């Protein structure tokens, strides 16, 4: 057993609230006195349908989702949505637009570009030579008014960038399609500013295995009949999310996280905590006299994924190893970026972030 509390800084699958894990443990063999474990429930049973509907309603309440938006709990991860969004919403359009600001929006752009009938235009990109150190302001996006949609990622998990203000377009412009995987539920925003939102659960929602999709009803009229039903949003909605067997346990766990977030005071309250957590780490980095480096423009720094390095690869490796010995786990940066990355999603307690900041100062004292 570790001498220290274990804090999981993984980018995903990520930390889950301790209270949620405790509830799941208590209900593992017998959910709510039914005698059934959730993992063994039929997805069409009244027991599971109640879990599904409560999860949907709680998410709708947390995000203030308008009535003219549908919520789906799908499979395939956010990467499936790169193509699924385009397959459903670009039909009959000559162009669609994409904003590339980091690793995942770049992959989304590349995947969408494989569609043969719709040209995916690069409306904006992050920095010279795609160095991803800054974010192009929304007013600089080269958006074609007659495009099918504009796709972007509001928070870049790998590169550690995040739009300070959640982007929105003026009335009459194409609908925004947003990858919110690594920031959904971390701060308030207006769902009505978007045509479609998707998010892999394994960061701020729950365990891996489910992807949340929030889509405006009028856009479902675009869904073509000549794509496979399993990739058609309308097919899933027409069957109340039961076109195929959903990820029942992941949905159950996500529902527990929604209830936990409500108990914390909702999104507005958790946003204040998230702001303090990010401030704690960035002040430690900026106050290190250059020992720790974060090259991201300050106004574009992510509050969810804090990236940093020492400038010495061997010292970075030592940092990750020594941190893990003190219960500060999974801090290694993404393979294409290197250095360290602290993912501080909703479920990461402030105590964990303060423990990391203390370790960073101690490490600098010993190796600086």
Swiss-Prot record:
It catalyses: O-phospho-L-serine + 2-oxoglutarate = 3-phosphooxypyruvate + L-glutamate; 4-(phosphooxy)-L-threonine + 2-oxoglutarate = (R)-3-hydroxy-2-oxo-4-phosphooxybutanoate + L-glutamate. Its cofactor is pyridoxal 5'-phosphate. PROSITE patterns: AA_TRANSFER_CLASS_5. Changing residue 289 to D: In strain: B293, Z3910 and Z3918. InterPro entries: Aminotrans_V_dom, Aminotrans_V_PyrdxlP_BS, Pser_aminoTfrase, PyrdxlP-dep_Trfase, PyrdxlP-dep_Trfase_major, PyrdxlP-dep_Trfase_small. One of its GO terms (cellular component) is cytoplasm. Keywords: Amino-acid biosynthesis, Aminotransferase, Cytoplasm, Pyridoxal phosphate, Pyridoxine biosynthesis, Serine biosynthesis, Transferase. The keyword Zinc-finger does not apply. Belongs to the class-V pyridoxal-phosphate-dependent aminotransferase family. SerC subfamily. Homodimer. This is Phosphoserine aminotransferase. It comes from Neisseria meningitidis serogroup A / serotype 4A (strain DSM 15465 / Z2491). The lineage of its organism: Bacteria, Pseudomonadati, Pseudomonadota, Betaproteobacteria, Neisseriales. The gene is serC.
